[in-house]
């Protein structure tokens, strides 16, 4: 069972992103404030769940959270400010939209750019440790998956309904054959041939 909070006396928002390592598409982030007594034994890191479980849990989170929101940063913005800053910006945009102002942010990962005057704590593999971060990971993942499924209808060659924009062999083969789209991140190592273009984390 994941932990319900880091500090019971503060309004905490868990934050996570999806799509950082993709070659195409926006990066999504979510922020979620759960009730302190929220319990769900299935809720875990979205990568550990089936697609069906993720969407079922999304409904529960949206229904039972005190507040939740999703932030998006486009491929053009990613190319302009780099993917790490874009991930932070997506989280900031999600927090911006929360109908309740949190007093503390729980961030998945080991780095974060401070949001206004709010204190934050970074938690490595936080989506497997805290309920609010796990909930945010599910919202970010499912909303981004919905977006990539829509893009797939426009550009079916790239298999985005399956790979969601990640660098699979089929995705890179399609880039070689058909070129790039307006949704590809042009600063990324799209063909996997130039290691100097990889962005270090």
UniProtKB/Swiss-Prot annotation:
SUPFAM superfamilies: Ribonuclease H-like
Protein's UniProt keywords contain Cytoplasm: yes
Domain RNase H type-2 stretches: 10-200
Catalytic activity: Endonucleolytic cleavage to 5'-phosphomonoester
Pfam families in the cross-refs: RNase_HII
Top-rank lineage group of the source organism: Bacteria
EC number: 3.1.26.4
Residues forming coiled coils: none
Chain sites annotated for binding a divalent metal cation: 16-17, 108
UniProt keywords, alphabetically: Cytoplasm, Endonuclease, Hydrolase, Manganese, Metal-binding, Nuclease
Cofactor binding note of this UniProt entry: Manganese or magnesium. Binds 1 divalent metal ion per monomer in the absence of substrate. May bind a second metal ion after substrate binding.
InterPro entries according to UniProt: RNase_HII (IPR022898), RNase_HII/HIII (IPR001352), RNase_HII/HIII_dom (IPR024567), RNaseH-like_sf (IPR012337), RNaseH_sf (IPR036397)
GO cellular component entries: cytoplasm; ribonuclease H2 complex
Segments crossing the lipid bilayer: none
Main localization, broad class: cytoplasm
Matches recorded under PROSITE patterns: RNASE_H_2 (PS51975)
Gene Ontology MF term list: manganese ion binding; RNA binding; RNA-DNA hybrid ribonuclease activity
Compartment(s) where it occurs, according to its Swiss-Prot or TrEMBL record: Cytoplasm
Necessary cofactors: Mn(2+); Mg(2+)
One GO-annotated biological process of the protein: mismatch repair
Enzymatic class: hydrolase
Family affiliation: Belongs to the RNase HII family.
Function: Endonuclease that specifically degrades the RNA of RNA-DNA hybrids.
HAMAP family associated with the record: RNase_HII_B
Protein name: Ribonuclease HII
Organism: Phocaeicola vulgatus (strain ATCC 8482 / DSM 1447 / JCM 5826 / CCUG 4940 / NBRC 14291 / NCTC 11154) (Bacteroides vulgatus)
Lineage: Bacteria, Pseudomonadati, Bacteroidota, Bacteroidia, Bacteroidales
């Amino acid at each position: 069972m994941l932990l319900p909070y880091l500090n019971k006396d503060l309004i905490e928002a868990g934050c996570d992103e999806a799509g950082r390592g993709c070659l195409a598409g926006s990066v999504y982030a979510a922020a979620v404030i759960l009730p302190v007594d929220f319990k769900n034994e299935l809720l875990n890191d979205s990568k550990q769940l089936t697609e069906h479980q993720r969407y079922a849990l999304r409904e529960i989170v949206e229904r039972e959270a005190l507040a939740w929101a999703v932030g998006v940063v486009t491929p053009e913005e990613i190319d302009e400010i780099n993917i790490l800053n874009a991930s932070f910006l997506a989280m900031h945009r999600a927090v911006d939209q929360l109908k309740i102002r949190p007093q503390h942010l729980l961030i998945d990962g080991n780095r974060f750019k401070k949001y206004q005057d709010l204190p934050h704590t970074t938690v490595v593999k936080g989506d497997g440790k805290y309920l609010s971060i796990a909930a945010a990971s599910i919202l970010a993942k499912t909303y981004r998956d919905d977006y990539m499924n829509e893009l797939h209808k426009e550009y079916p060659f790239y298999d985005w309904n399956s790979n969601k924009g990640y660098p699979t062999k089929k995705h890179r083969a399609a880039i070689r054959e058909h070129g790039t789209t307006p949704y590809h991140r042009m600063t990324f190592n799209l063909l996997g041939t130039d290691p100097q273009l990889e962005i270090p984390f």
